[in-house]
Structures are given as C-alpha cells and as structure tokens.
A protein has these predicted regions:
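Regulatory cytosolic signal-relay segments
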Residues: 82-145
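Catalytic NTP-binding/metal-coordinating core of nucleotidyl cyclase/transferase enzymes
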Residues: 141-216
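Hydrophobic transmembrane alpha-helices
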Residues: 32-40, 51-100
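Catalytic core of nucleotidyl cyclases, primarily class III adenylyl/guanylyl cyclases
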Residues: 187-213, 229-268
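Generic alpha-helical transmembrane segments
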Residues: 17-39
Length: 320
C-alpha cells in the first residue's frame, strides 16, 4: 500500500507504477509481517522500556527491514532479467538513490511505520476490543451476552510474595502476566481483568466453544510457562504454577465509570467460576471445567476428562 501511494503521488496512476508497487510491496509486506509475528522475544526483551523508547526502536527496526528488503528485491529483479527490470522499473536505481526521491520515500515509510506501530501498541496495552467498544458506545446501554470465562490463579502466591519481597514479587508477576498474554491472544481470548495474582480471560460463547479453544488456551499457557521455565528458575528461583476454572453462560455487560470508563461483566457465571476455582485445591485439580461447558464442546482426542462429581458451591443454592 505504501509503495502504491508513493507511486501514485509521484507519477500519477498508471499500470507501470501499479505493477512496480505490487512486485516490490507484496513480498516485502509478507516478510515484515512474518518478522513481526515472530518478534515475541524482541518484545519480551524490551517490555520494560518506556512506551516511546520502545515505539521508536521498533519503528526504526521495521523501516530498516523494509528498506533492506526493498533494495534486495530490486537488485534481484535486475540480476534475473535486465529487460524485465527496465520494463517494471522505468526509473534507474541511480536516479532513485541520487535524488530526493529516496528521502521522500524514507520519510513516508517512517511516518506510516510510526503511526501503525503506535496504534498497535495502543491496542496491545489497552485492549483492541475494549477500545472499539468504548469508542463506538457498544455497551453504553446495559446488554446481556453469552460468554465463557477462564479464571487463572497463581498457586502459593502469599508464600511467594513473603519469600521474594514486594518489589521482586511485582517483577515476578509482571513477567508471568506478560508471558501468558501471548497464548491467550493466540487462542482469541481477551484479558478482562488482572485481580492480584489472578487473570480473568473471556470469549464470546461460540468462539470459545468452537474447537474447544478456551480449554486448549489453558494448556497453551502451561506450555508457554514451561518454555520460559529456565528463565524463571534463574531469575526468581521458581517457576509459576497455576490453577484454572472454566465456565460460561449469560452475563450482563455494560460500560461503567465516568472518568475511567471500562467494560464490566456481572452475573452468576463469574461468581460460579470463582467458586469453582476455589475447589481446585480441594480436588487436587489444575483445571476444572463445568459440565455445562463440556456438554457444548467437542474435546480434542488427546485430552481426557474426569468427572469430579456434583458440588454445592459456597453461596450457591444450585449444585454444579
């Protein structure tokens, strides 16, 4: 798109400009998209930098990749077939490099990259759905929705906090919450709240039930923590261990707050899920899934479910 806009602004619309932009931009765009989706380690290393330092660094990184790949593709076209190059790129490389066109193009690339990275980081920090819903006023009026909720709670958090001290424990939670966010997003979950050492993840009901996405998300989170277990052992002397509960149903959702508005969920579903989470220790289970959820989704063949029985949860009249 950037190549097409530049070509149109510089030379007006013509098929040569369009073909130039497509031939150069499509492989460059795919390559940069691949690099960015594989940049988990880059984000992880620089996550404690200030927002603007990280933003500028990431933008510079993308622009460097962009220009390197662009030049590589142009040189490759020349090497493969000079006649083809002269047809597709009517302006010589020397003309492009030796005039202000290069600086114009770099300025456009830098501005577009900075703006897109700013939006991406804003979405990542504040929540993509939350921003759209607040701006569009989707929940300005109270509504009911069918949703799934996954409560993930860190085990032995009180003992860990006393052992590490408040400051070190806060760093520990930062790393833990950061690392589990990637698999949550990969499985289409949205973090609703961080409550102490607990994270609440939610899905629209059908999206979470399809292919048992919500259940598989839990195991993806486990895998992510195992991936960084050596880091946690070296940095903190322990690896996070957690339990979780999954339940779903009808909840009330609305926009609350005047000066710090947010989307809030209310209803029996959240209370029940929290009570289920409290049963994990008693039942020696890392994950409890309600029979209501099990009955509406098809579990992967590699997962085995055990019926834990029927329980009267605290504060609940109906058994689950």
């Amino acid at each position: 798109l950037l190549f097409a806009v530049y070509a149109f602004a510089r030379y007006g619309f013509n098929w040569i400009a369009l073909s130039t932009s497509l031939i150069a931009s499509v492989p460059v765009g795919f390559a940069i998209a691949f690099f960015e989706t594989q940049s988990q380690e880059f984000r992880r290393r620089h996550r404690r930098n200030s927002f603007w330092i990280y933003l500028v660094y990431r933008t510079f990184r993308v622009v460097v990749w962009f220009m390197m790949l662009f030049f590589f593709i142009m040189l490759l076209v020349i090497w493969l077939n000079v006649d083809t190059y002269e047809t597709i790129f009517p302006h010589s490389l020397y003309d492009f490099f030796a005039t202000r066109k290069l600086f114009e193009f770099l300025a456009i690339a830098l501005a577009v990259s900075l703006f897109s990275n700013f939006l991406d980081e804003l979405h990542r920090k504040l929540g993509r759905d939350a921003i759209y819903n607040l701006v569009l006023g989707k929940y300005h009026q109270v509504k009911q929705e069918e949703r799934l909720f996954l409560f993930i709670d860190l085990n032995d958090s009180t003992d860990i906090a006393e052992e590490m001290g408040e400051l070190e424990y806060s760093h520990f939670l930062q790393d833990y919450f950061y690392d589990i966010s990637e698999p949550i997003a990969r499985y289409f979950g949205r973090v609703y709240q961080y409550v102490g050492d607990e994270v609440v993840v939610t899905w629209p009901l059908q999206k979470g039930l399809r292919y048992a996405v919500a259940v598989r998300c839990y195991f993806a989170v486990q895998k992510q923590i195992r991936r960084y277990s050596a880091y946690y052992e070296k940095r903190y002397g322990r690896v996070p261990v957690f339990k979780a509960a999954l339940h779903g149903g009808t909840v009330v959702v609305s926009e609350v707050g005047k000066y710090k508005s947010e989307i809030a969920y209310h209803g029996d579903v959240l209370n029940t899920t929290a009570r289920m989470l409290g049963k994990c220790h008693e039942l020696a289970s890392d994950l409890l899934v309600s029979n209501w959820v099990i009955g509406q989704t098809t579990m992967p063949a590699y997962l085995k479910t055990d019926d834990m029985g029927v329980f009267q949860l605290k504060g609940k009249q109906q058994e689950i």
